[in-house]
Each structure stands twice: as C-alpha cells, then as structure tokens.
Design a protein with these regions (language model features):
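His-enriched metal-coordination microenvironments in redox/metal-binding proteins
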Residues: 25-31, 48-53
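Short beta-strand scaffold segments in enzyme catalytic cores
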Residues: 29-34, 136
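Catalytic phosphate/metal-binding cores of nucleic-acid and nucleotide-processing enzymes, i.e., regions
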Residues: 34, 43, 51, 68-69
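Short acidic-glycine loop/turn motifs at beta-strand connectors
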Residues: 35-40, 139-142
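Glycine-rich catalytic cores of cysteine/serine-nucleophile enzymes that process amide/ester linkages
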Residues: 43-59
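Low-complexity intrinsically disordered segments
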Residues: 62-147
Length: 147
C-alpha cells in the first residue's frame, strides 16, 4: 500500500491534535510526606508528574490543610498514580476512567494492596532516604511544604 504525501500529512496532523487534546502524564516519580510535631516523617509514592511544576504545584495550591494531607497519605498507602486537586473519588471515578481533577490512587481506584509507604526518623533521614527523583515534605510544625 502506497501512502501519498497528503495522507501522511493528514496522519501527522491527527497525531498532533491527539497529543494536544490529551493531558499526558510523565512518569517522573516523587515521594510526598508529612513530618509530625515530634519530627517523624511518613510518606508515600507518586508515579507521575513529580517535578515542581507538577506535583509540587498541586501540593502548594490544593494541599494546605493537615487533615487533607493526612487523608491523601492514607488513601495513598498503595501508591498514587497521579496527583490532582481532589481526593474525593466518586461513583464514576476509577483508575481506567478517572474523573477530571481527581487524584488516582492505586489502592482505592485499582484495587492494589501494595504498601508503598515509607517511615523516617526525621527530616534528614527523609532527605537522604527516599529513592524518587523529587521529594516533598509538609511540616506540621512549620505549616509549609519543603521540596
């Protein structure tokens, strides 16, 4: 089968339109964690968009409340595929068909039961002990995110 120049151009333009229409997640791994008032740190794994303009920005804008951060970590015990502003889920939300703006959890949304959490004795141990490209820690004492 011979493809004409016009047909090849049409295929390329369709692919470009498809990429432009979708928000693609990049597998830049990160760890998010919370430091309690005693200095102990607990965290979990996030698979996608771990860079500052991804997970870092979402955390700074939408995760300022201690209870929401703790719920995020609790729901993320089996890991988090992609972090968005909401952690509520919903009847129509699933791993394969996520609702827009909903965080995608491996446990709640895909039924996995892995333990992707980590525990550290203090923030120094967290800083040197995680294995992902990016790490974010919320300090309950300081009431702010560190990266």
């Amino acid at each position: 089968m011979k493809i004409t120049k016009e047909r090849l151009l049409q295929i390329v333009n369709e692919e470009i339109a498809t990429f432009s229409a979708k928000k693609l997640n990049e597998a830049t791994r990160s760890t998010i964690a919370i430091e309690d008032k005693n200095g102990k740190v607990r965290g979990t794994y996030i698979h996608s968009d771990g860079y500052l303009d991804g997970v870092g920005e979402v955390l700074a804008k939408h995760y300022k409340d201690k209870k929401k951060i703790e719920k995020l970590l609790d729901l993320g015990k089996a890991g988090i595929s992609a972090l968005y502003k909401s952690i509520d889920g919903g009847d129509d939300h699933s791993f394969n068909s996520p609702e827009k703006g909903e965080t995608i959890f491996y446990g709640r949304d895909r039924g996995e039961d892995n333990d992707m959490t980590s525990q550290f004795k203090d923030r120094d141990a967290f800083a040197t002990g995680h294995s992902e490209e990016f790490a974010y820690m919320y300090s309950m004492k300081d009431k702010k995110w560190y990266s």
